[in-house]
């Protein structure tokens, strides 16, 4: 598991003005910040990246960093350091991001470009085997016959970390709402590890550090099992997690009972946040100390939600962001 790199300073300065965007605490929690790009910044960004279709970003990976630089330059180079400090800050580590005027499925390509730019200011998004690209778009409908809970609308998708069944480092997760029709419910669910009242009990359990087998269903296009413990620590010895109830494969009675109790303790936590994410907005979270999931939808025959995800690793100049602080 990748060790979390901590920073000393809080990313939020309540009195600071930013160029090209605003930053405020969310209504749900001071740990979750809302970042909004201004109408002018959004317009200029989309104009400057218009020459590159999404396919160009798929084929030429360096262009993902090119569009990231364009966005940061439009924000007077204040955006990249703020994103990194927020996501690496244990007290926060989560952002709800949107751009004024980008809020319709007809702008889906523009949404992908914007999310790609933000993600590549903090690192690089990994190859997504489910889609064959560095991002994945998928649809939730009223009826689902898939082999995981990802697209099933009428049940809660339990809280989990991403990247549990792959060998690549998964430091961050980005989840964007591209479209929504005939939709009620289905809020994003978030739980910060430090707000989980049962953390100490499970983190100190003898099974917390035992390597366990994680195996994905066929739809994930990953055939190799991986082995790792559910819990680890960051560079300061604080708990981090790499867990999903659907894909962990207990080898015996002891592991199975413990994992079942762990799942119940997570799902019944009083620290869970319910966060509405309108079309065009996206969540960006530190995957090592935030768990995420989704609440159930109200059934409707024409229910439709389209999502886009990216997940990857942090990468930055070490002389700008101190470790062990």
Curated annotation (Swiss-Prot):
It catalyses: glutarate + 2-oxoglutarate + O2 = (S)-2-hydroxyglutarate + succinate + CO2. GO terms for cellular component: protein-containing complex. GO terms for molecular function: ferrous iron binding; glutarate dioxygenase activity; identical protein binding; iron ion binding; oxidoreductase activity, acting on paired donors, with incorporation or reduction of molecular oxygen, with 2-oxoglutarate as one donor, and the other dehydrogenated. One of its GO terms (biological process) is response to carbon starvation. Disruption phenotype: Cells lacking this gene accumulate higher levels of glutarate than wild-type during carbon starvation and entry into the stationary phase. Its EC number is 1.14.11.64. Fe cation binds at residues 160, 162, 292. Gene3D superfamilies: Clavaminate synthase-like (3.60.130.10). Induction: Expression is induced by RpoS during carbon starvation and at stationary phase. Is also regulated by cAMP-CRP and Lrp, which play the roles of a nearly essential activator and of a positive modulator, respectively. Repressed by CsiR. Makes part of the operon glaH-lhgD-gabDTP. Binds 1 Fe(2+) ion per subunit. Homotetramer. Belongs to the glutarate hydroxylase family. This is Glutarate 2-hydroxylase. It comes from Escherichia coli (strain K12). The lineage of its organism: Bacteria, Pseudomonadati, Pseudomonadota, Gammaproteobacteria, Enterobacterales.
């Amino acid at each position: 598991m990748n060790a979390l790199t901590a920073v000393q300073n809080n990313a939020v300065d309540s009195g600071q003005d930013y160029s090209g965007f605003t930053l405020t605490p969310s209504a749900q929690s001071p740990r979750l910040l809302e970042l909004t790009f201004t109408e002018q910044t959004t317009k200029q960004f989309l104009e400057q990246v218009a020459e590159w279709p999404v396919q160009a970003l798929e084929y030429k990976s360096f262009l993902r960093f090119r569009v990231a630089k364009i966005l940061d330059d439009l924000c007077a180079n204040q955006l990249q350091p703020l994103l990194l400090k927020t996501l690496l800050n244990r007290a926060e580590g989560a952002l709800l991001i949107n751009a004024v005027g980008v809020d319709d499925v007809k702008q889906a390509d523009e949404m992908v470009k914007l999310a790609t730019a933000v993600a590549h200011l903090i690192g690089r998004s990994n190859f997504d085997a489910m889609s064959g690209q560095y991002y994945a778009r998928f649809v939730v409908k009223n009826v689902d016959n898939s082999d995981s809970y990802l697209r099933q609308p009428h049940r809660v998708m339990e809280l989990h970390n991403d990247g549990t069944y792959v060998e690549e480092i998964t430091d961050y997760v980005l989840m964007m709402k591209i479209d929504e029709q005939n939709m009620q419910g289905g809020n994003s669910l978030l739980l910060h590890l430090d707000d989980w009242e049962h953390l100490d009990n499970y983190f100190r359990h003898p099974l917390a550090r035992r390597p366990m087998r994680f195996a994905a269903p066929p739809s994930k296009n990953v055939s190799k099992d991986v082995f790792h413990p559910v819990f680890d620590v960051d560079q300061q010895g604080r708990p981090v997690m790499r867990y999903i109830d659907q894909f962990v494969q207990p080898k015996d009675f002891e592991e199975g009972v413990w994992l079942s109790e762990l799942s119940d303790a997570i799902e019944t936590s009083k620290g869970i946040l319910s966060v509405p994410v309108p079309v065009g907005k996206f969540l960006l979270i530190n995957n090592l100390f935030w768990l995420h999931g989704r609440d159930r939808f109200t059934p409707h025959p024409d229910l439709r939600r389209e999502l886009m995800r990216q997940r990857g690793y942090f990468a930055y100049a070490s002389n700008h962001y101190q470790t062990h602080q």
